[in-house]
Regions:
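Surface-exposed, charge/polar-rich loops and edge strands
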Residues: 1-274
Length: 274
């Protein structure tokens, strides 16, 4: 079964928003608890048939649902569903179960996108070597008095040898492409791969990823302990995510950190045996 929903988003719909707002104001929540990470989770249910029908009709008019988190789970569910449709005994579940996966859907204006930051090994380079090679790659470098997240696109914060630096891609050749022009792509193509040897960030053991919700000090802690250098990135906009999807392209790996994050196990989609 599924214990964690795929995270979907859509362009705001006024009908759906009004019903959700009314439900939260007029009804008592079904669940209201605080998880182990001190995050509060509140869940309301909608049982009014008129509201449910209005939501269903509104979603029929929405052209696209965009995957914010759960691309691999969606692809896996699709493959399982195709096998079941072809009569393949790929699992012990009924055809209807296998052809569906669990999803949580949020309007785009209800999401908070945070930076998905990098911390990595220095690849045998000294601090001076790293600074020199980053400058040669076309970045300006400014020392900061304290750690801070970037405030604009094509700007990065780097923590190295207990010092924070602001990097700006001033002389970097940025392609006119919705994916290649993302900050995460600029950093990967011009810094992480050529300087640190990170060719595939999904599988390389010398890099790890830290959501901005954990704070700037977590990047310091990692670089001062099991890693050597950390990079903080400016968040990708929801508009960029939708533009990339509409263009038929795929977001780079580990490029977005979305909130709210539903706690795993809050919703279950069980597969029933044949």
């Amino acid at each position: 079964g599924n214990t964690e929903p795929v995270f979907l988003t859509y362009k705001k719909n006024d009908v759906i928003s009004r019903i959700l707002d009314k439900t939260m104001k007029e009804k008592e929540p079904e669940y209201d608890f605080t998880g182990l990470d001190d995050t509060r989770h509140i869940l309301w249910t909608i049982s009014d048939e008129g509201d449910l029908d209005a939501i269903e009709q509104a979603f029929k008019k929405i052209d696209s649902l965009y995957i914010a988190d759960g691309h691999h789970r969606s692809a896996s569910a699709y493959k399982v569903g195709k096998k079941k449709q072809g009569g393949s005994a790929c699992c012990g579940c009924t055809s209807g179960d296998a052809e569906r996966f669990m999803a949580a859907v949020f309007a785009s204006d209800e999401l908070n996108i945070l930076g998905y930051n990098r911390t990595l090994k220095a690849n045998g380079l000294s601090g001076n070597d790293i600074l020199k090679r980053i400058e040669e790659a076309g970045f300006s470098i400014e020392k900061l008095s304290k750690g801070e997240f970037p405030s604009e696109k094509r700007s990065f914060s780097m923590y190295l040898d207990k010092t924070w630096y602001k990097l700006k891609a001033e002389s970097v050749d940025v392609p006119d492409d919705v994916v290649e022009s993302l900050d995460v792509s600029i950093l990967q193509k011009n810094v992480l791969e050529p300087i640190f040897g990170i060719k595939d960030p999904r599988t390389d053991e010398n890099i790890d990823f830290v959501g901005a919700s954990r704070g700037i000090t977590e990047l310091e802690r990692r670089a001062d302990s099991d890693m050597d250098v950390s990079f903080a990135l400016f968040p990708v906009s929801i508009e960029s995510l939708m533009d990339i999807s509409d263009a038929g392209k795929i977001m780079p790996p580990k490029s977005t950190w979305f909130e709210p994050k539903l706690i795993s196990g809050l919703f279950l989609h069980l597969f029933h045996d044949r």
